[in-house]
Swiss-Prot record:
Residues 88-98 have a biased composition (Polar residues). Pfam families: GET2 (PF08690). This is Golgi to ER traffic protein 2. Coiled coil: none annotated.
Length: 357
C-alpha cells in the first residue's frame, strides 16, 4: 500500500518537474520557435512555408509586461495598453496567423434570424392574412380560385367545350343580381370570357369593389326612374279621370244598359281614347329611356324563370339558347304590366265613384 503511494507521488513529482522545466524553457523566448517547428513538420507542401505564429505563453508574458508598465506609470510615461498591443501586430504574418487560427467572431443573430416581412409576403401570395399569418385570407383565396376557374373557362370556350362548373358559377352570379345584366359586376366579366371583358389577372380588389358599387348605383337608378314613371302615370290617370268627371254629367260605371247608352249623347269613349294615348306615350318613353341607360333587362335577370333556366342548363346545356328569348319576353311583360297597373287604377276609381253614388 505504501509502495503504491510512493510510486504515485514520484510520478507526480516527475510531471511537476517536467512541467517546470518546460515552462523555464518557454520563458527564454523559444516557445514560438518550437510551435513554428511543429507546424512546419506537419506541412505537406514543402515549398510553401507556414505563416509564423506566436505562442500563447509569449502572449501571456507580453501582457504581464504591459500590465507592469502601466502600473509603474511614474517611471515610464509612455505605456502601451494590452488591447493596443494586441490590436497592432508586429508583422503581416502574425496578423494572418491570428485570423487563420483564432476562433471566429460571434455572428449576430439578426443576420440569421427569419425575416417576418418575407414570411408575410410569402403568406400573402399563398392566401395568408398579413395581420394573422396563421389564418388564411379567405377573400384572396376565393378570388384566386375564381381567376383560375375563369381562365380554365376561357380555354374551354376556345376549344368548344362546356364547363359545368362555369355554368354553376354563372348561375350564382345571376342569382346575386347587380349590374346591367343583373350579375355581380366584375364577376360576370370574369366568367363570361367575352373579348371586351378584362383578363382575370387584371381584376384587383379595388376593381371588384368598383364593380359592386357600380351595381348598387344601377339598382338605385332603376328604382329611381321606376318611381318617377309611377308618379307620372298616377297623376296622368287621375287628371284624365277628373277632367271627364267634371265635364261629363253622370260620368260613372254601371251595369245598366241605359247608362252605357249615354255614350251616344255624351262622348264617354273619349276617356279611354285619352287614357290609351297617354299609356302608349308613357310606355314608349319608358322603353327608350331604360334601354339607353342599360336598365331595361336589369330587373329581369332576377326573375325566378331565368334562375331556373340557369340551374337546369347545368344538366341540359341546350336551354341556354332560349335564355335570351325568355329575357326579351320578360322585358315586354314589364311594359305590359305598366298598362295593366294603370288600367287597374282606373277600375278602382270607377268603383269608388259608383260606391259613392
Amino acid at each position: 500500500m505504501s509502495e503504491t503511494t510512493d510510486k504515485q507521488l514520484t510520478e507526480a513529482e516527475k510531471r511537476k518537474l517536467l512541467r517546470e522545466r518546460r515552462l523555464a524553457k518557454m520563458a527564454q523566448g523559444k516557445a514560438s520557435d518550437r510551435l513554428n517547428t511543429i507546424l512546419s513538420q506537419g506541412s505537406s507542401v514543402k515549398s510553401v512555408s507556414p505563416p509564423a505564429v506566436t505562442s500563447v505563453l509569449e502572449n501571456k508574458a507580453t501582457k504581464s509586461t504591459d500590465t507592469a508598465t502601466v502600473t509603474d506609470s511614474s517611471t515610464n510615461a509612455t505605456s502601451v495598453s494590452p488591447s493596443a498591443a494586441k490590436a497592432t501586430p508586429t508583422s503581416t504574418g502574425v496578423s494572418s496567423a491570428i485570423s487563420d487560427f483564432d476562433d471566429p467572431e460571434i455572428q449576430d443573430i439578426s443576420d440569421v434570424a427569419v425575416n417576418n416581412s418575407g414570411v408575410l409576403a410569402l403568406g400573402n401570395l399563398s392566401g395568408l392574412d398579413s395581420n394573422n399569418p396563421s389564418q388564411p385570407n379567405l377573400d384572396e383565396m376565393f378570388q384566386k380560385i375564381m381567376q383560375q376557374q375563369s381562365q380554365h373557362n376561357c380555354d374551354n370556350d376556345n376549344n368548344g367545350e362546356n364547363n359545368p362548373m362555369a355554368e354553376m358559377l354563372k348561375m350564382f352570379n345571376s342569382m346575386g343580381g347587380g349590374d346591367n345584366n343583373g350579375g355581380l359586376g366584375g364577376f360576370d366579366s370574369m366568367f363570361s370570357g367575352s373579348p371586351n371583358s378584362p383578363p382575370p389577372e387584371s381584376i384587383s380588389p379595388e376593381m371588384m369593389k368598383y364593380q359592386a358599387d357600380l351595381a348598387k348605383y344601377h339598382t338605385y337608378q332603376e328604382q329611381l326612374w321606376q318611381f318617377r314613371f309611377l308618379v307620372v302615370r298616377i297623376l296622368a290617370t287621375i287628371f284624365n279621370f277628373a277632367y271627364h268627371f267634371i265635364t261629363i254629367p253622370s260620368f260613372t260605371a254601371s251595369n245598366h244598359a241605359y247608362v252605357r247608352d249615354l255614350s251616344e249623347v255624351y262622348p264617354l269613349l273619349g276617356f279611354m281614347t285619352i287614357f290609351t294615348s297617354i299609356e302608349v306615350v308613357i310606355i314608349a318613353t319608358y322603353y327608350l329611356l331604360f334601354t339607353k341607360l342599360g336598365l331595361f333587362h336589369a330587373s329581369n335577370q332576377k326573375s325566378f324563370i331565368l334562375k331556373g333556366i340557369s340551374t337546369l342548363s347545368m344538366f341540359v346545356p341546350q336551354l341556354l339558347r332560349y335564355e335570351p328569348l325568355v329575357a326579351t319576353f320578360l322585358g315586354y311583360k314589364e311594359l305590359l304590366g305598366i298598362f295593366v297597373g294603370d288600367l287597374s287604377l282606373v277600375v278602382v276609381m270607377f268603383g269608388l265613384l259608383s260606391f259613392s253614388n
